[in-house]
Amino acid sequence: MTLTKVELADNLIEKHGLNKSEAKALVEDFFEEIRVALEKGNDVKLSGFGNFELREKASRPGRNPKTGESVPVSARRVVVFKPGQKLRARVEKTKPKS
């Protein structure tokens, strides 16, 4: 199962009595703040949850899987999520659904 932004908003409505537009705006604003920080080149640290970090990837040779032709892959910046210790511990305790 995947948790969506709509489901996050629904959970806020249920747990905190927000109306639908407030909950949706809160979820959108939360993710927008993370996006803006990352666009500015800042890491995002959410205590008890984890960190979103920016990493620079160097250019490298790649390969077109269809043709086998060698293709250069340009340098780029990527976002990496590193879960915090508390999140890792909680996930490790949870039994996977079959």
From Swiss-Prot:
Keywords: DNA recombination, DNA-binding, Transcription, Transcription regulation, Translation regulation. One of its GO terms (molecular function) is DNA binding. PROSITE patterns: HISTONE_LIKE. The keyword Transcription regulation applies. The keyword ATP-binding does not apply. GO terms for biological process: DNA recombination; positive regulation of metabolic process; regulation of DNA-templated transcription; regulation of translation. Gene3D superfamilies: IHF-like DNA-binding proteins (4.10.520.10). Pfam families: Bac_DNA_binding (PF00216). GO terms for cellular component: cytosol. This protein is one of the two subunits of integration host factor, a specific DNA-binding protein that functions in genetic recombination as well as in transcriptional and translational control. Belongs to the bacterial histone-like protein family. Heterodimer of an alpha and a beta chain. This is Integration host factor subunit alpha. It comes from Mannheimia succiniciproducens (strain KCTC 0769BP / MBEL55E). The gene is ihfA.
